[in-house]
From Swiss-Prot:
The organism's place on the tree of life at top rank: Bacteria
Membrane topology (UniProt): Multi-pass membrane protein
Gene: sam
Name the record gives this protein: S-adenosylmethionine uptake transporter
Activation/inhibition comment: Transport is inhibited by S-adenosylethionine and to a lesser extent by S-adenosylhomocysteine. Unlike eukaryotic transporters is not inhibited by sinfungin. Also inhibited by 2.4-dinitrophenol, suggesting transport is an energy-dependent process.
Species assigned in the record: Rickettsia prowazekii (strain Madrid E)
PANTHER family for this protein: ACYL-MALONYL CONDENSING ENZYME-RELATED, SOLUTE CARRIER FAMILY 35 MEMBER G1
Amino acid sequence: MNDALKTYLNGICWFLLSLVTSSINDVMSKYLGTRLHSFEVAFFRFFFSSIVLLPFVVYYGKNALKTSRPFVHVLRGLLLFFGMTSWTYGLTIAPVTTATVVSFAIPLFTLILAVFILNENIIWQRWVVTVVGFIGLVVMLKPHTKDFNPEILYLILAAISFAMLDIINKKFVVKESMLSMLFYSAIVTAMVSLPVAMQYWITPSSFELALLFVLGSSGSFILFFLLKAFSIVDATATAPYRYLELVISAIAAYFIFNEFPDKSTVHGAVIIIPATLFIIYSEKKSMSSKHESQ
């Protein structure tokens, strides 16, 4: 095995770790959300996340928390609150695999939001692919059938929130430290969640508290795994492997919740995955062209 292949496989392994952790997070969120309110799950998730980050704050010192855009951190925290509470609630309504496929559509929402917020010019091919991707969402969610549950749209609202976060990250927080982004967002989200969570409070069991701690910790681990992967291989090299999360989620959901993806989820995934792959590679090509022209 040559060095280039070893490096590539090393990067992919780190990326796969992020997928496994993300799938486990969804399974834990669904399990916790069946008894605890999504507001309470969000509070504990980000409360424990901020606690886990404290040793890093102490180690790197107050300079790591310096920020020139406090308002942006507040906005990110509000979007995280809205996104994670909607996502957790949606997971209690829909199968884990359905939620996973919805997450694949986030680049579609990001593309549309980028037009209005960043004033980006989008080539017509991307618009066509975006429409195709949304057709895939319709195929999966089946809004035209009697089996449609409107509450599943909470997953769509969450996806839009996460797309907004991507836009904010792209526009505002380039010069912010990763630690400040994580820590301030966790603090804001926990503070916003607590008053609402108190209205629906159910004291967690010891086991639930342990899961909530793991949930709060693993969010930072996902980011670490992703950054590690992207430091070794190009982000577009990992794109095809992103969709292995559907397989991982399906296996976990089957053994824990006895869920199995229905035909509409599979059909929707078959449409959405190629659409988002095209957008990812198109974005990469566009960025490369801009870089070469500078």
